[in-house]
Amino acid sequence: MQVILKEKVENLGVLGDIVNVKPGYARNFLIPFGKAVQATQANIKAFEAQKAELEKAEKARFEAAVAVADAIKDKVYTIAAQAGEGGKLFGSVGTAEVAEAVSNQSGKKIEKSQVRMPEGVIRSIGEFELTVHVYTDVDADIKVNVVAAEA
């Protein structure tokens, strides 16, 4: 199925590209989430008329994402967690806890789906380097310091 992309989609294309995708991917993800429209002659003409407006909106979203990334990057965020002897945590610190800590300590809204933990969840106290994927092609490297919570 051919679709016209209304925004940049990772591993697929950028705004205005006409790409071939599987019908289920188009019907269940791209079209319902407003990322693409079916590539009919009428939609192609309508898209050409809207292209400048969509590019302007995409640029605004990108600039907002860069501003968020600049505000949160290169900072250390502290998370208090229950820990036993030897610095081993009771449980773990995952993406939800990291997103909440970054949101609270920076004032910028971060979703848990934006937090990238390449080594998996954190299970001990210490300082860890993580990445926050703010937007397509916009990542911010952060440090998370997990400390033992006061009893």
Curated annotation (Swiss-Prot):
GO BP of this protein: translation
GO cellular component, one term: ribonucleoprotein complex
UniProt GO molecular function: rRNA binding; structural constituent of ribosome
Keywords from the named record: Ribonucleoprotein, Ribosomal protein, RNA-binding, rRNA-binding
Pfam families assigned: Ribosomal_L9_C, Ribosomal_L9_N
UniProt xrefs under InterPro entries: Ribosomal_bL9, Ribosomal_bL9/RNase_H1_N, Ribosomal_bL9_bac/chp, Ribosomal_bL9_C, Ribosomal_bL9_C_sf, Ribosomal_bL9_N, Ribosomal_bL9_N_sf
Domain of life: Bacteria
Entry keyword annotation includes Oxidoreductase: no
NCBIfam families: L9
HAMAP family referenced in this protein's UniProt entry, alphabetically: Ribosomal_bL9 (MF_00503)
Annotated PANTHER family: 50S RIBOSOMAL PROTEIN L9
Role noted for this protein: Binds to the 23S rRNA.
Protein name listed in UniProt: Large ribosomal subunit protein bL9
Organism annotation: Francisella tularensis subsp. tularensis (strain SCHU S4 / Schu 4)
Lineage of producing organism: Bacteria, Pseudomonadati, Pseudomonadota, Gammaproteobacteria, Thiotrichales
Gene name of the encoded protein: rplI
